[in-house]
From Swiss-Prot:
The protein's name in its UniProt record: ATP-dependent protease ATPase subunit HslU
Organism whose genome encodes this protein: Francisella tularensis subsp. tularensis (strain WY96-3418)
One example GO MF annotation: peptidase activity
Cellular component per GO, a single term: HslUV protease complex
HAMAP family: HslU
Known function: ATPase subunit of a proteasome-like degradation complex; this subunit has chaperone activity. The binding of ATP and its subsequent hydrolysis by HslU are essential for unfolding of protein substrates subsequently hydrolyzed by HslV. HslU recognizes the N-terminal part of its protein substrates and unfolds these before they are guided to HslV for hydrolysis.
The keyword Nucleotide-binding appears for this protein: yes
Chain sites annotated for binding ATP: 19, 61-66, 268, 333, 405
Organism classification: Bacteria, Pseudomonadati, Pseudomonadota, Gammaproteobacteria, Thiotrichales
Localization: Cytoplasm
């Protein structure tokens, strides 16, 4: 997809979901386009060109995570978001940073497996239908004598076979049209191997995962007859047939390549593993996490159960609010590995208005769609939208700035009564006015103590 996506196109796509923050959008758009540019180079030059990792700096709720998440969807690339605070230095209790790459590979394998299954959907559907038809119309057997010669003429056998095929096609059409969905049949299905719980100490998740895989591989493939509706049986049989048709070794190879060439790791809360400049105490584990991240970000080799991964060309996007610590509190080596710095701005009232209205699945559109399921036509006046934005901004200023997430809290409080009474409401056209917003939220905003706990 990135082949035809210029940086301007990428920014335009991001603008459908994220309001403002143009500097951050441009930075990630250039990084994504550089992926494609690198793949056009000759092999020798391609190995030398490494991604320019990004450090996003900005308060919570301004779009840091959303930018990275949408970028991964646009790139159709393996993507993982991790909290830097979840990891500890090697030797301490907790997850070590190499598990980031192992989780990224797992994500890529699932992604490539789904892609492979999609390619064989039609064939798998046909085979699944055949399995159901074999239960509904068991294939006729030609009666044979003890010496192995057929007792009936060949013409009769051919006629029976033709009649059987016609019957099968009639039933196939009925299955495809959903006419037999609720009919129950007994079908042979594969039994999923039982998961064996392995107790392991904290931080040893990789070892316990490998032990579970070992026990699973030792269990033989068992099958059992199960009674279910045809609708469910078709889905189950289709999944089983698709799994047989795909090449697992090819999936693994393509997943490893996708991670190495296009993988994106989003490191959130990077500021929480900074050593505070004012703190003279021992922050061994925090600084240790940064030192462990260094080889990953710079380029190293990580062993996974699917194969070895080189992290040289994986794009790392780190982000943090940096309220207490500063970017300069990161260890110098890690600062050097995050050359592109982008500062995301705090949201203003106008930004809140746009967030409510403009994105493809904006908050207002979501609530309107939810109420539509109850037969209620919900609408908002322009002044009411601005008032909601002003309230969200004011509460952020006075209580705690949580960015755009404040809008969800405000909207839930505003529409609480309508949402609760929706099934019994006689009036199906509801228009939200400024007066209604003031009535529901006015007192809460004025009373700082109340807004602190409710909004």
């Amino acid at each position: 997809m990135t082949q035809i996506m210029t940086p301007k196109t990428i920014v335009h796509e991001l603008e459908r979901h994220i309001i403002g923050q143009n500097d951050a959008k441009k930075a990630v758009a250039i990084a994504l386009r550089n992926r494609w540019r690198r793949m056009q180079l000759d092999n020798e030059m391609r190995q030398e060109v490494t991604p320019k990792n990004i450090l996003m700096i900005g308060p919570t709720g301004v779009g840091k995570t959303e930018i990275a998440r949408r970028l991964a969807k646009l790139a159709d690339a393996p993507f993982i978001k991790v909290e830097a605070t979840k990891f500890t230095e090697v030797g301490y209790v907790g997850k070590d940073v190499e598990s980031i790459i192992r989780d990224l590979v797992e994500t890529a394998v699932k992604m490539k497996r789904e892609e492979a299954k999609e390619k064989v959907t039609e064939k798998a559907a046909r085979l699944a239908e055949d399995r159901i038809l074999d239960v509904l119309i068991p294939p006729a057997r030609t009666s044979e004598s003890k010496v192995g010669f057929a007792n009936e003429p060949a013409e009769d056998a051919a006629s029976k076979k033709e009649k059987e095929n016609k019957t099968r096609e009639i039933f196939r059409k009925k299955i495809q049209n959903g006419e037999l969905d609720d009919k129950e049949i007994e079908i042979e299905v594969a039994v999923a191997p039982k998961t064996i719980g392995v107790m392991g100490p904290p931080g040893m998740e990789d070892m316990t995962s490998q032990l579970q895989d070992l026990f699973s591989s030792l269990s033989t493939d068992k099958k059992k007859n199960k009674k279910m509706r045809i609708k469910d049986a078709i889905k189950l049989a289709q999944d089983e047939e698709a799994a047989k048709l795909v090449n697992e070794e090819d999936i693994k190879a393509r997943a490893l390549e996708a991670v190495e060439q296009n993988g994106i790791v989003f490191l959130d809360e990077i500021d929480k593993v900074c050593r505070k400049s004012s703190n003279s105490g021992a922050d061994v584990s925090r600084e240790g996490v940064q030192r462990d991240l260094l080889p990953l970000v710079e380029g190293s080799t990580v062993s996974t159960k699917y194969g070895v991964i080189k992290t040289d060309h994986i794009l790392f996007i780190a982000s943090g609010a940096f309220h207490v610590a500063k970017p300069s509190d990161l260890i110098p080596e890690l600062q050097g590995r995050l050359p592109i710095r982008v500062e995301l701005k705090s949201l203003e009232i106008e930004d809140f208005v746009r967030i409510l209205r403009e994105p493809d699945c904006s908050i207002l559109k979501q609530y309107i769609a939810l109420m539509k399921t109850e037969g209620i036509d919900l609408s908002f006046e322009e002044d009411a939208i601005r008032k909601i934005a002003e309230i969200a901004y004011k509460v952020n200023e006075e209580v705690e700035n949580i960015g755009a997430r404040r809008l969800h809290t405000v909207m839930e409080r505003l529409l609480e009564k309508i949402s609760f009474d929706a099934p019994e409401l006689v009036e199906k056209n509801i228009n939200i006015t400024t007066d209604y917003v003031n009535e529901k939220l006015g007192n809460l905003v004025k009373n700082k103590d109340l807004s602190q706990y409710i909004l």
